[in-house]
């Protein structure tokens, strides 16, 4: 069944520590049974090894869902037919919320494929039940009382439905755009892997029993114990030798990779004009196929010159990285700093500045927890999206003044760069909240003071009126 999905402020699914996004596809709607869900009419699908995440485009906080891949019993794909979009039909098995361990009778919560949380024994034992007529009673028609074969869905005599299919156990993924075949192959691969794991957990008792028997036959007496200890030491020595050999091979491979990257960069610099764009795209496609470049889930998103899906996912990824850097309400980074921080977190397959700026233009239109502001000089700043953000920045600047401050002291106290500090002080000065004065002793430094001239002028005006 489908469960409620918790999303991040950047409208990305909250992943488990061992999860990573394998595939992304937008313009997808959901069907529960054969009925179209109007609350889940358009969204983005994210596939991992454990879940299928649906993040709604209209209201991601309320309408986002997730499906466990271990709950999927069957996967079917239907292609486009006239005006009907291609769909992936997910038949879900009924998973009990709790199950009792047959060894220690501990009540576990979750999928029965997981081992018991108390004794650690997998749920691979079945209790043999006596034969009865319960199987054949399942095919009894309630309309004409005809005894049908248990696996039939409809009565052979009157055509009455024998089995009630729960609409929550059949979910259809409707792909309004492309990508249904690729997504189906990925889901099918993950479900097959889950079935293999389920089969191995169920039938690995023979292998375990054989290993215990072989170990017990080898061990016997003090001489065998000493021999076993010597064999273990020799095995550990061989393991260390192979490890250092692999480490040397890794370092040599790293040098070759760096030289290959230098040749790659020289070839890029040698191309010009339209030839550069075509050749660059070919080389990037080849390098991605060979696994030379490695990044986050953006590498699984189709990219093109006008790919809005890629820009949206890049915008979400940028906000995720910046939110780890912006802790307080007054923290601020520039566009250049944000670009450097994000590419440093990727480590490879870096984002060019033009693509980064194009994705950042979507930040204010998307609810990702980050907002931008443009200063008078054209400098673009990133900060956390909070209520009355400009008032909080002004209060922070005024608190630094005791009773005056310099740009350097203000930058150190608020953890801003000197450029951002000068922009903020200039903006506050233009708004009339602070004033500047040349520091006479040093001759070059500027002191910023709170603007108390307005209050003084009001008091003087009031005094003259009274007199």
UniProtKB/Swiss-Prot annotation:
SMART domains cross-referenced by the UniProt entry: ZnF_RBZ (SM00547)
A single cellular component GO annotation: cytoplasm
InterPro entries: GLUE_dom, PH-like_dom_sf, Snf8/Vps36, Vps36, WH-like_DNA-bd_sf, WH_DNA-bd_sf, Znf_RanBP2
Location within or outside the cell: Cytoplasm; Golgi apparatus
GLUE C-terminal domain location: 170-203
Keywords attached to this entry: Cytoplasm, Golgi apparatus, Metal-binding, Protein transport, Repeat, Transport, Zinc, Zinc-finger
Domain GLUE N-terminal: 5-94
Complexes and interactors: Component of the endosomal sorting required for transport complex II (ESCRT-II). Binds ubiquitin.
Protein name: Vacuolar protein-sorting-associated protein 36
Phylogenetic lineage: Eukaryota, Fungi, Dikarya, Ascomycota, Taphrinomycotina
Originating gene: vps36
């Amino acid at each position: 069944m489908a469960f409620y999905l918790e999303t991040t402020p950047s409208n990305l699914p909250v992943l488990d520590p061992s999860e990573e996004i394998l595939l992304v596809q937008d313009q997808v709607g959901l069907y529960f049974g054969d009925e179209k869900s109007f609350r889940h009419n358009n969204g983005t699908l994210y596939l991992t090894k454990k879940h299928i995440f649906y993040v709604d485009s209209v209201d991601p906080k309320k309408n986002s869902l997730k499906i466990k891949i271990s709950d999927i019993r069957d996967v079917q794909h239907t292609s486009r037919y006239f005006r009907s979009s291609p769909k992936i039909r997910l038949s879900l098995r009924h998973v009990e919320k709790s199950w009792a361990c047959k060894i220690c009778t501990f009540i576990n919560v979750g999928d029965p494929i997981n081992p018991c949380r108390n004794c650690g024994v997998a749920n691979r034992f079945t209790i043999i039940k006596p034969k009865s007529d319960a199987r054949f009673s399942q095919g009894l028609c309630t309309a004409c009382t005809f005894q049908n074969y248990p696996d039939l869905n409809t009565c052979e005599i009157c055509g009455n439905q024998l089995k009630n299919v729960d609409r929550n156990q059949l979910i259809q993924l409707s792909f309004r755009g492309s990508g249904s075949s690729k997504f189906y192959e990925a889901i099918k691969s993950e479900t097959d892997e889950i079935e293999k794991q389920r089969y191995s957990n169920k039938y690995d008792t023979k292998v375990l029993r054989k290993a215990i028997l072989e170990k017990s036959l080898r061990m016997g007496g003090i001489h065998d114990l000493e021999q076993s200890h010597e064999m273990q030491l020799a095995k550990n020595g061989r393991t260390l030798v192979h490890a250092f050999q692999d480490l040397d091979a890794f370092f040599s491979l790293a040098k070759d990779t760096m030289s290959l990257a230098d040749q790659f960069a020289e070839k890029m610099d040698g191309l010009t004009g339209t030839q550069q764009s075509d050749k660059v795209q070919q080389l990037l496609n080849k390098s991605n196929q060979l696994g030379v470049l490695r990044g986050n889930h953006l590498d699984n998103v189709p990219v093109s010159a006008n790919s809005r899906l890629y820009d949206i996912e890049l915008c979400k990824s940028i906000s995720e990285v910046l939110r780890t850097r912006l802790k307080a309400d007054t923290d601020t980074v520039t566009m250049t700093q944000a670009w450097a921080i994000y590419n440093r977190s990727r480590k490879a397959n870096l984002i060019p500045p033009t693509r980064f700026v194009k994705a950042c233009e979507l930040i204010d239109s998307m609810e990702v927890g980050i907002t931008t502001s443009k200063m008078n000089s054209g400098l673009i700043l990133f900060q956390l999206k909070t209520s009355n953000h400009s008032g909080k920045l002004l209060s922070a600047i005024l608190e630094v003044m005791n009773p005056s401050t310099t740009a350097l002291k203000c930058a150190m106290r608020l953890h801003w760069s000197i450029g951002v500090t000068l922009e903020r002080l200039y903006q506050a000065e233009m708004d009339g909240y602070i004033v500047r004065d040349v520091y006479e002793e040093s001759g070059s430094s500027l002191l910023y003071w709170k603007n108390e001239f307005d209050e003084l002028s009001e008091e003087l005006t009031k005094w003259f009126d009274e007199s």
